[in-house]
Curated annotation (Swiss-Prot):
It catalyses: (2R,3S)-3-isopropylmalate = (2S)-2-isopropylmalate. Its EC number is 4.2.1.33. Belongs to the LeuD family. LeuD type 1 subfamily. This is 3-isopropylmalate dehydratase small subunit. Pfam families: Aconitase_C. The gene is leuD. The keyword Phosphoprotein does not apply. Heterodimer of LeuC and LeuD. Pathway: Amino-acid biosynthesis; L-leucine biosynthesis; L-leucine from 3-methyl-2-oxobutanoate: step 2/4. It comes from the Bacteria. GO terms for molecular function: 3-isopropylmalate dehydratase activity. Catalyzes the isomerization between 2-isopropylmalate and 3-isopropylmalate, via the formation of 2-isopropylmaleate. One of its GO terms (biological process) is L-leucine biosynthetic process. Keywords: Amino-acid biosynthesis, Branched-chain amino acid biosynthesis, Leucine biosynthesis, Lyase.
Length: 197
């Protein structure tokens, strides 16, 4: 997982609320178990509309998604996070997230930032009037900055540390590889092992 400290990019305003994981990536796209190849399924139904925000040329290459309240509700599917990342998003900002989606996002390296709805609406207005507006999401200072605006956000220290170190669950486990090997070496041979034969 790539470490995340500070990211400056352009934002795309998704003025929709109650976006569930099936809208993020429909079930028909869930036939893979790798983390790549999902960009084509991201918001697949909505992208059929030429006027959909991701189809508009002024938002091409934007890597911060600014969504309405209740983003990522519905069924638990890591594929929703993978699709957003595969499309190029590093950050999703919303007033509220589905709990499971937010947990999956943060564990997978996609920063899910909660800002008050009024702050999200103000950010929408700015990026709609000037899509080239740089937006900085600073995990070190826990701030979102754009134009002359600075907004703080909350994130627990442990999750923040994991993101800044670039550690997913596998990365955390691998940090203890020597201790795991030492434990396995001390176990009786007749017990199950995690070591390769």
């Amino acid at each position: 997982m790539e470490p995340f400290t500070t990211h400056t990019g352009r934002a795309v305003p998704l003025r929709r609320s109650n976006v569930d994981t099936d809208q993020i990536i429909p079930a028909v796209y869930l036939k893979r178990v790798s983390r790549t190849g999902f960009a084509d399924g991201l918001f697949a139904a909505w992208r059929q509309d030429p006027g959909f925000v991701l189809n508009r040329p002024e938002f091409a290459g934007a890597d911060i998604l600014v969504a309405g309240p209740d983003f990522g509700t519905g069924s638990s599917r890591e594929h929703a996070v993978w699709a957003l990342q595969d499309y190029g998003f590093r950050v999703v900002i919303s007033p509220r997230f589905g709990d499971i989606f937010r947990n999956n996002a943060l564990k997978g390296g996609l920063l899910a930032v909660v800002l008050p709805e009024s702050d999200v609406e103000a950010l929408w207005d700015v990026v709609e009037s000037d899509p080239a507006t740089p937006v900085t999401v600073d995990l070190v200072t826990r701030e979102v900055r754009y134009a002359d605006v600075v907004r703080g956000f909350d994130i627990d220290d442990y999750t923040r540390w994991r993101l800044m170190e670039g550690l997913d669950d596998i990365g955390l486990t691998l940090r203890h590889a020597d201790a795991i090997d030492a434990f396995e070496a001390r176990r009786p041979a007749w017990k199950p092992t995690t070591r390769a034969s």
